[in-house]
Amino acid sequence: MRMELIENLLQLLVTFVGALLSGISYRKSGRHAYFLLLCFYGCFALGALYWTLYLLLFDTTPRVFYVSEFGWVASVIFLRILQATLASQDERSFRCRRAWLAPAFGVPLLAFYCTFGDILSNLIWCGMMIWLSFCAIRGLVYANGQTGAARNMRCFHIGVLCFAGSEYLLWTAGCFWPDTSPASPTFWCDMLLTLAILGLLPATRKAVDA
């Protein structure tokens, strides 16, 4: 439990710093992309804050996890809005067969996760990850065909794919190894997710300059 607390404190710190830096960037530049990134980090931090405080006060994981989930779901919604905001009209209308890898990979995982947990929660989370991944793959393929600053969007799309992939890894590991000690793959998958969340800040900065 102590390692889970340290892990959640680290995630809370990363999201708080991300929100702070995004807010500073928004204040300096006035770009709406930074405001949306601030909302992403802020909502994720609120979810992590509830989880961390519960661990501190009661030395156990929250029984009512929906409180944190509201914050985390909201953060992913803001990430999707950010993704749509940064995409050009040509990118949004770009047709890419490889983007269908997202549902081809995500739907079987959804069926698998539903055997372990709440069906509605899994539908919401996997649906959002499939949507994010679909748009990220399409955007990455589109950006690879561009020249100059437009190619900087690749970093953002890769960052979103790393975030979605880390979420999938964490959920899958949690099904087999619910323990959160450093000996468990779940612990390291959660650390990987924290790094992916942190990486979205420089990736967004590069995309804004595209």
Show the residue positions of the predicted features:
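Alpha-helical transmembrane segments of multi-pass integral membrane proteins
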Residues: C39-G47, G71-A84, F94-G117, G127-C135, ...
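Hydrophobic alpha-helical transmembrane segments
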Residues: S22-Y26, L109-D118, V141, G174
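Membrane-interfacial loop-to-transmembrane alpha-helix junctions, especially the N-terminal start
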Residues: K28-Y41, E91-L101, T147-G159, D209-A210
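Internal transmembrane alpha-helix with an interfacial aromatic "cap," most often the third helix
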Residues: G18-S29, W51-L101, I137-L140, L200-D209
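Hydrophobic alpha-helical transmembrane segments of multi-pass membrane proteins
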Residues: L10-L21, A33-L57, S68-V76, F156-F176, ...
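Membrane-interface helix caps and helix-loop-helix hairpins in membrane proteins
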Residues: L56-R63, F112-L123, F176-T180
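Hydrophobic transmembrane alpha-helical segments in integral membrane proteins
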Residues: M1-V17, F116-C126
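C-terminal transmembrane-bundle signature of multipass membrane proteins
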Residues: F134-A210
